Each structure stands twice: as C-alpha cells, then as structure tokens.
Regions:
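Conserved acetyl-CoA binding element of GNAT-fold acetyltransferases
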Residues: 91-104, 276-286
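Amphipathic alpha-helical segments in well-structured domains
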Residues: 94, 111-115, 132, 136
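Active-site/acyl-donor-binding loops of N-acyltransferases
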Residues: 2-9, 63, 125-193, 243-245, ...
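Conserved acetyl-CoA-binding loop-helix of GNAT-fold acetyltransferases
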Residues: 99-121, 128, 288-300
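Extreme N-terminal starter segment of soluble prokaryotic enzymes
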Residues: 12-13
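Residues that line or immediately flank small-molecule/substrate-binding pockets and catalytic motifs
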Residues: 81-82, 99, 104, 130, ...
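Amide-forming acyltransferase catalytic core, primarily the GNAT-like/NAT-type
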Residues: 3-6, 23-87, 92, 145-275
C-alpha cells in the first residue's frame, strides 16, 4: 500500500502503554482474537495488568506499545514483557514481544510501526517465540532474524495408535471411526508398549517434585555451558505461578531428575492431560545426563496418561531425541529474535543459547 493511499496511518503515532489503556486493549483483543483462556473482560484486564504492569522485571524503559490512530483512539497494541538473561556471565536486558494486534481500519503501516518501535528499544535482545508466517515476514523485513533450530518441534508418540486416531478428521464420520476403532487401538498400543525398548524407560535415577527454589539452584549449575541463558533472579515463583494458569494443555507438572548418586541430572516442566499430548515447557540437563532426563520426562508423561510428548527443540538435545525415535517438524510457530549486539545474535545463530518456552511468550495465557 502506498503512502498516498493510507493518509490515516501516516498521522497516527506509537506511544507507551498506560494502565488506563487496559479497557481499550481488552476490547481490541476481544474483537480480533477468537481464542482466549479468560472469557470475561474483567478477568482478561486483570491478567493484562499483572503481566504488563506488575511483572517482576518491570522496566519503564521497556513499556508495552500503543498505536493511536488519527482520532487519538487505540487502534493497535504490542505487549512487552521485560526479562533478564546473562551473556558470557554478564547481565543483559531482554524484551519479549507478544499480543501484536491492529484494528482492521489501521492495518498496514500501523503494525510495522509498532514492531519497528519495539525492535529499536534499549534492550540487548528482542524475542517473540509464537510468530506466524506474516509476523515472521514483517520481523525479517525490519532486520530481525528467525532461529530455525529453536523453531523445530519434536514429538514422541507414547500411544501411537491412540495418537493416530486422535488426528482423524472431526465431524460425525471421524468420531464414528474413532469409536469403532477403540478395541483395535487399545490392542495396538498394548502391543507397542510390550515391544522391547518401546518407551525407553530410564535406567536408574529418580524424579522428585520441582520447587522454584530447587529449579533456581539447578539452573545456576546446569545452564553454565550456555553463553546466553536466563537469569531468574528470585522471580521463578511468580513466573511458575503464572505459567500454571495456562490450562490449554492440562496441568503443569515439574520434576527434578537425580542421578543414582543423588546428584542433579536435570529437570523438566510439562503440561499434561490424560488422553492428550504433553507439551514441554522446559527441559534441561547436564550434557552427560540428558538421556536420563529425557527418559524420566517420557515416563512421567506416559504414567499420567499422555498419548504423546512434544516440545521445542534445544539443538544440543538432538542425539537424545533421535535415540528415542522422536519426529521433528519445522512448520512453526517461529522463534524470532533481534539484537544490535552481533555477539548476542551470534550466540542465537550457533545454538549457544538456552531459550525454552518458559523464557519467551509461549507460557502466557491470554
């Protein structure tokens, strides 16, 4: 669209979000997005206030952004959640972009101006890890990059027959076929489970419940091998509490995996619902213990009734995932990033960054 054909967009402006914008932002979101985990306007407004105004990393220099149209009305929004990470053992500022939305009347330059304002902020690293194809194109056109490795999704079938049936088309025909196939599905999964090495059950070690303080201490040890890694700095209790409110994929479960000698091997956080796919929020382990940690994750999901486990790829885990027969796909969502510091961008490019779903926007539950 040429500038001549979009005079209204030319006179709009991007400004910092204020708490008194909440009603307008909630109204805009309810107009544009069909899915929400918070159906009432009051509940959604309260959640937006908590995330954008009262998170533990609030930074006046990293506000969420509003696009005002030529009439001074809220016509666009880009949420910003400041986070902290360390790069080569020194603190850096990170900004997570989320909930980009623009009213139909202002589409075109408005979204571009919001993303440009976000990427040119004072943060060392900008991240958005739920990008669709349109967002990816916009992001890259403004100088941002996509982490292809971190955008890969892996999946391990635990009950392969039930998983296949769950992906039949909807409607009466699909439901009827699924119902008729139940006896064969149960038999097929029983035979698959009996096959030697079918689930790769862990040999040794044990899993205990994962508390925020335990995770924080383990992260200090286990993540040291990454040049770029999260700095939770006392905020894990808040972060995990918010993540637990995400109910789309079931209950959030965490497990600390210990080696046979009691030493910490790693941990996992995943959402589990019986009969569904367990979605991994975070998976971490010492290089020598990754196979053990992955085995305990898969066993925990199987024991809780999941039919599959899926997560976002950490490149260093490829050998262990391959050994478990995990499938890979790269059809999005895209993990997008931008940094004005070449050395930080290089760490992302070469996979020397620990960036789990807990460290972006994926855990949010709007």
């Amino acid at each position: 669209m040429s500038a001549r054909l979009a005079p209204a967009a030319a006179v709009g402006r991007v400004r910092p979000f204020r708490p008194d914008d909440l009603a307008d932002v909630v109204g805009l979101r309810r107009r544009l997005f069909r899915f929400t985990e918070r159906p009432s306007p009051a509940e959604l407004a309260d959640y937006c206030y908590r995330i954008f105004c009262r998170n533990p990393w609030s930074d006046d220099e990293l506000p969420s952004l509003i696009y005002e149209d030529q009439r001074g009305e809220v016509a666009g929004f880009l949420g910003v959640v400041p986070r902290r990470m360390t790069f080569q053992d020194k603190p850096i500022r990170v900004a997570i972009g989320t909930q980009l939305m623009v009213s139909p009347e202002s589409r075109g330059l408005a979204g571009r101006r919001l993303v440009r304002a976000f990427l040119t902020g004072p943060q060392d690293l900008s991240v958005s890890d739920l990008g669709n194809d349109a967002t990816r194109r916009l992001w890259e056109s403004l100088g941002g990059s996509v982490s292809m490795a971190h955008s890969v999704i892996w999946e391990k079938a635990l009950r392969p027959c039930q998983l296949a049936v769950s992906r039949l088309g909807g409607g009466a025909l699909g439901r009827g076929a699924a119902l008729a196939a139940q006896p064969l599905v149960a038999l097929g999964d029983a035979l698959a489970a009996a096959w030697p090495g079918a689930h790769g059950r862990p040999a040794g070690g044990d899993t205990v419940p994962l508390a925020p303080a335990t995770l924080a201490a383990a992260a200090e040890e286990v993540l040291q091998t990454f040049a770029l890694r999260p700095d939770y700095n006392g905020a894990l209790a808040w972060l995990l509490g918010q993540a637990a409110e995400k109910r789309e994929f079931g209950e959030l479960i965490g497990g600390l995996v210990r080696q046979s000698d009691g030493a910490v091997a790693g941990w996992f956080l995943h959402y589990v619902e019986p009969g569904g796919t367990s979605e991994v929020l975070q998976l971490a382990g010492r290089p020598s213990s990754r196979a053990l940690v992955l085995g305990h994750l898969l066993e925990d999901a199987r024991r809780r009734g999941a039919i599959a486990v899926a997560g976002r790829l950490e490149p260093a885990w490829l050998p262990e995932l391959a050994a478990q027969g995990c499938a890979l796909r790269d059809d999005g969502p895209w993990v997008l990033y931008h940094s004005s510091r070449p050395e930080v961008a290089a760490a992302m490019e070469r996979g020397d960054a620990f960036l789990s779903r807990l460290d972006g926007e994926w855990w949010l539950s709007f």
